[in-house]
Amino acid sequence: MEGKTLVLGVIGADVHAVGNRILDYAFTQAGFKVINIGVLASQEEFIRAAIETAASVIMVSSLYGHGELDCRGLREKCQESGIGDILLYVGGNLVVGKQEFSEVEKRFLAMGFNRVYPPGTMPEAAIEDLRKDLEL
């Protein structure tokens, strides 16, 4: 898995750090090089880290319910920055209130995300998807 780098962080005004650390550990143990930009991260910080490290994937976490607002336009900014083909994964409690996950997923896929995960998804699911999407 040499060279398979991913950028991991918690977007927006979200300070939920525990899940971020768990994901960092799980992806590292699975053999990925994790660039963890931590909490309170802007879209620009994700993109800058991805460019600087030649990452294959940006993984966005959001637990405070405003992920939909915070993630809007990320794919377009990636395209403008020359990394339009990068894989975009997002997961967590992405919206305020109780909404059908299938509807939330549709909206994030329409925003250009490749994978969307509901609250409570185990890291192994994302690891399996990473291996498929990166053809490992």
Curated annotation (Swiss-Prot):
GO terms for molecular function: cobalamin binding; metal ion binding; methylaspartate mutase activity. Keywords: Cobalamin, Cobalt, Isomerase, Metal-binding. Belongs to the methylaspartate mutase GlmS subunit family. The lineage of its organism: Bacteria, Bacillati, Bacillota, Clostridia, Eubacteriales. It catalyses: (2S,3S)-3-methyl-L-aspartate = L-glutamate. Pathway: Amino-acid degradation; L-glutamate degradation via mesaconate pathway; acetate and pyruvate from L-glutamate: step 1/4. InterPro entries: Acid_CoA_mut_C, Cobalamin-bd, Cobalamin-bd_sf, GlmS. Its cofactor is adenosylcob(III)alamin. It is an enzyme of class 5 (isomerase). CDD domains: Glm_B12_BD (cd02072). Adenosylcob(III)alamin binds at A13, D14, V15, H16, A17, S61, S62, L63, N93, L94, V95, V96, G97. Gene3D superfamilies: Cobalamin-binding domain. SUPFAM superfamilies: Cobalamin (vitamin B12)-binding domain. HAMAP family: Me_Asp_mutase_S (MF_00526). This is Glutamate mutase sigma subunit.
